[in-house]
A protein has these predicted regions:
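Membrane-proximal intracellular helices of multi-pass ion channels
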Residues: 1-335
Length: 335
C-alpha cells in the first residue's frame, strides 16, 4: 500500500520532465513549483486513503470478513496482487461478490484523480477527463467482446474478474481452465491502465497515441495536401513529436527488457512458454494466476541468479528505464 502511494508521489515529481500532455490532465499550471507539488501530493494522499477506506467498507457490506476486506482493500488500490489466503475462492463465495470485486479493481485502473474530478466537475475542462474517457470506452469494448464471444463455456462473472484484474495489473483470479484466453489476458496486462494510477503496463493512451500517430503518418504520405492533427478524441491537446518519441522509446525499452528476461529464463531451464508469460508478468508487476496458465508455477525451484534477475526487472518495469534516462538528461546533461 505504501509502495503504491510512493509511486503516485513519484509521478508528481517527474511529470514536469516526462510528459507535458499528461500534466495538462492534472493541473493548469505551466510548471510545478514546490507549493503545487505539495498540493497535488496531499490531494493524492487523501484520495488514496479515502478510496482504500471506501473499498474496505463496500467489501464488508457484501459479507466479506473484515480481515480479508482490509487485505483486499490494500491490494486493490495499490495493484499489489497480495492475498491473505492461497486461493481467492476461499474469500469470494458467490457471483455478487465476484462482480463487486471486479468493479472495485478498476480503482487502480482509472486515474486516482478520476473521482475527484467528477465531484468537482464544474471547475474542470475536458482535458482533465480525456484519458479516463478513453479507458471507459476501452473497458466497455473489451467486456462486450468477452461477453459475446468468450462466455459460452465459462461463467461471465469469472471472465469479468480476470479482465479487471489483468487491466489493473493485479493478477489474481478464480481458478479456471481458460488456456485459450491466456494470451488475451497477457495482452491486457501489457496495455495496462491510466498514467496516474498504481497499475503498470505500457498505458493504453500511449499505445493509442502511437497508433494514431502512425496512421496519420501513413495518410500524410498518401494524401500530402491534407493536414492530419495528432489529437485524440475528448481533448484539445495535441501530442508533439517529442512526446511520441518518448512513447516509442517506452515500447522499445519494454521489448528489449522482455527479450533479455525471456532469454535468461529459457537458459535457466524454464520452458519457453512459461518464460514468455513470466517475463510479461514480471515487467508489468502482475502476480501469476490461472488466468495466465501459471498458477502452479513454483518459484522455490528457481536459482538465486534468476530470482535476483526477476527482482531487477520488476524494478525496471515499475520505474521504467526511460524515466531514469530522462532524469539524467534533465539534471546531468543540461549542456
Amino acid at each position: 500500500w505504501i509502495g503504491g502511494l510512493y509511486f503516485l508521489f513519484s509521478i508528481i515529481f517527474l511529470i514536469d520532465i516526462y510528459d507535458e500532455s499528461f500534466k495538462k490532465t492534472l493541473t493548469n499550471f505551466f510548471s510545478f513549483n514546490s507549493s503545487e507539488v505539495l498540493k497535488q501530493a496531499f490531494k493524492i494522499f487523501l484520495l488514496y486513503s479515502g478510496i482504500t477506506l471506501i473499498i474496505f467498507i463496500i467489501l464488508n457490506i457484501f459479507s466479506i470478513r473484515s480481515f480479508d476486506s482490509l487485505n483486499l482493500a490494500f491490494s486493490l488500490i495499490s495493484s499489489g496482487g497480495f492475498l491473505p489466503v492461497n486461493d481467492l475462492s476461499n474469500i469470494i463465495k458467490d457471483k455478487t461478490q465476484v462482480i463487486i470485486l471486479s468493479i472495485l479493481m478498476l480503482t487502480s485502473f482509472f486515474s486516482i484523480f478520476f473521482s475527484f474530478n467528477i465531484i468537482f466537475l464544474k471547475n474542470k475542462n475536458i482535458n482533465f477527463f480525456y484519458e479516463d474517457l478513453h479507458l471507459i470506452i476501452y473497458y466497455i469494448v473489451v467486456v462486450t467482446i468477452f461477453f459475446l464471444f468468450f462466455s459460452f463455456n465459462n461463467e461471465f462473472s469469472s471472465n469479468l474478474l480476470s479482465i479487471s484484474s489483468s487491466m489493473s495489473n493485479i493478477g489474481f483470479s478464480l481458478e479456471t481452465n481458460q488456456s485459450n484466453l491466456n494470451l488475451v489476458y497477457l495482452v491486457l496486462v501489457i496495455i495496462g491502465g491510466s498514467f496516474f494510477s498504481t497499475s503498470s503496463g505500457l498505458r493504453f493512451i500511449k499505445i493509442y497515441s502511437l497508433f494514431k500517430f502512425s496512421i496519420n503518418q501513413i495518410l500524410s504520405f498518401s494524401r500530402p495536401k491534407n493536414i492530419f492533427m495528432n489529437k485524440l478524441i475528448f481533448t484539445k491537446i495535441n501530442f508533439d513529436f517529442d512526446e511520441i518519441n518518448k512513447y516509442f522509446l517506452t515500447v522499445l525499452v519494454f521489448i528489449l527488457s522482455f527479450f533479455i528476461l525471456t532469454t535468461l529464463l529459457s537458459i535457466s531451464g524454464i520452458n519457453f512458454e512459461n518464460s514468455f508469460k513470466l517475463s510479461i508478468l514480471t515487467l508489468m508487476n502482475t502476480v501469476n494466476s490461472s488466468s495466465y496458465g501459471l498458477s502452479d508455477f513454483n518459484f522455490n525451484n528457481l536459482n538465486f541468479f534468476i530470482k535476483y534477475s526477476l527482482i531487477f526487472f520488476m524494478i525496471i518495469g515499475r520505474i521504467e528505464l526511460l524515466t531514469i534516462l530522462l532524469i539524467i538528461k534533465k539534471f546531468l546533461l543540461k549542456n
